[in-house]
Amino acid sequence: MSKVIGIDLGTTNSCVAVMEGGDPVVIANSEGARTTPSVVSFQANGERLVGQVAKRQSITNPDKTIISIKREMGTNHKVNIDGKQYTPQEISAMVLQKIKADAEAYLGETVTQAVITVPAYFNDSQRQATKDAGKIAGLEVLRIINEPTAAALAYGMDKMDTNQKIFVYDLGGGTFDVSILELGDGVFEVKATNGDTHLGGDDFDKKIIDYIADTFKADNGIDLKNDKMALQRLKEAAEKAKIELSSSTQTNINLPFITADATGPKHIDMSLTRAKFNELTQDLVDRTIEPMKKALNDAGLTINDINKVILVGGSTRIPAVQEAVKSFTGKEPSKGVNPDECVAMGAAIQAGVLTGDVKDVLLLDVTPLTLGIETLGGVATPLIERNTTIPTKKSQVFSTAADGQTSVEIHVVQGERQMAADNKTLGRFTLSGIAPAPRGVPQIEVTFDIDANGIVNVSAKDKGTGKEANITITASTNLSDDEIDKAVKEAEKFEEQDKKRKESIEIKNNADQVVYQTEKTLKDLGDKVSSEDKKAIEEKVEAVKKVKDGDDLEAIKKATEDLTQTFYGISSKIYSQNAEPGADGGANSGANPGGTTGNTDTKDDNVVDAEYKVDDDK
């Protein structure tokens, strides 16, 4: 059986490892380096360069050099090279092809299968895009796993005898994640995850670039940001300065002949201290604090519950980052494994688990964002809450919103907002062939199934006719770059507004339902209701209809309650008249054909217009 490789497909650098003799081994690339820049370049003669050679010539060929494409995964972003458009998946596949070739050269055999890691906070579209990139590169992706989980594996946490709670801080080239894992008896269970898919080492580089460019402009009146070749040289110098400041308190930035004007050539020769670098990047470090707090809170833990802290990603070499983590956790982070290599090593261990080479290890990851569907009134009804352990499967029964409805559209959303329109649309599909019936009668079972890769399948089944429809959520390619981390931030910002909107919809839905049930029951009772009582009810019905589409919620509630009480009174009178002599009356114990307020009849419809039950199958 051929080897299964573990790949850390990074924003700035990628790494590959394989299990040998029971241990993960990092595979060096054809240039002899243990990591490969995630850079692709196209030459004038049509040749394509990948990795270090592509990065080296980026200064002279900035227009046709693609960097940090991982930030665009799962979006509709396209790269235009000589009139041909490339998707992020295609560019990533070029990096994977290079990694695959290097692994094959090392192993001396063809490689067809891999485990690839992604940031824990990647959404469904981004995960699917990563899997597609592997397929394009000729790799069967056996599993997509979260980077922090892979890192914990690489640190040998599975060999611990006692239960441990691990705090994983992962700051890479373009993404940031923090995860809380509970480990014991070879089981790795992710308790919570949080992060920012648009924060990483690239942002630290940009701060230095801006500082150099602004200083140069102030001194010389020339904006280097308008010169692509000069800007590429600034990027290289900024990255080099950042790395040097991790071990030195000061570095020199020397860029001769950066540009020229009428007075002659211009040069950059300046110093950058670690103190100044820390000042420039303080806001970036601060952005990592809130996700740490949220992850702890979601896990139901305090910092005192944490046994060990792990740093992952090259950007964690920055002293200010290390200090921030130490200050927050009160613990010295573990530094036993190279932060650039540990994720690939963990992926290789997981590959070993899947092939049976590694025994007694079980990974239990979580889904980063809530999954649900749109229900009556545009409400997002959750089926699987964020931080639910995967793989998982959950079902819930819904119904129709109109009489005689023969089809329903299932709108699948992902996010933390209470209204469907404010969340990320993952897909839509239609279930047809529902037998015509009064609204609320058909039973439509919607099932969400998330596999171990975090990829979603959704199905809907009419329990009456047996008709079924389903969708596998694939990369929708319409994500904006910051959409995933905006989901939770917006949920907090608009939480109060969301609550009010949801309350408004629930009140209006209830009013509409009370009117519907009252008119239906009135029609069913026919002559049993006196003309005087019928007129009283119809007046109350009209009163509700007049206000139910307005914005005065108190007026809607009052009119609905008035109608309900009037109907109760008349219902009681009818049952009293029909009761047999000697019976106990039953006026207040019997059926309430129009009871729909949700306060007195447990069978009433709520905002999703149906009863439901939840079946968990993990």
Curated annotation (Swiss-Prot):
Gene Ontology MF term list: ATP binding; ATP-dependent protein folding chaperone; unfolded protein binding
Pfam families assigned: HSP70 (PF00012)
Induction remark: By stress conditions e.g. heat shock.
Keyword Phosphoprotein included in the entry's annotation: yes
Modification type Phosphothreonine: residues: 175
TM stretches of this protein: none
Keyword Cytoplasm applies: no
UniProt entry keywords in alphabetical sequence: ATP-binding, Chaperone, Nucleotide-binding, Phosphoprotein, Stress response
Residue stretches of biased makeup (Basic and acidic residues): 601-618
Region entry Disordered, spans: 576-618
Comp. bias (Gly residues): 583-597
PANTHER family (alphabetical): HEAT SHOCK PROTEIN 70KDA (PTHR19375)
HAMAP family: DnaK
Entry function: Acts as a chaperone.
Family statement: Belongs to the heat shock protein 70 family.
Name the record gives this protein: Chaperone protein DnaK
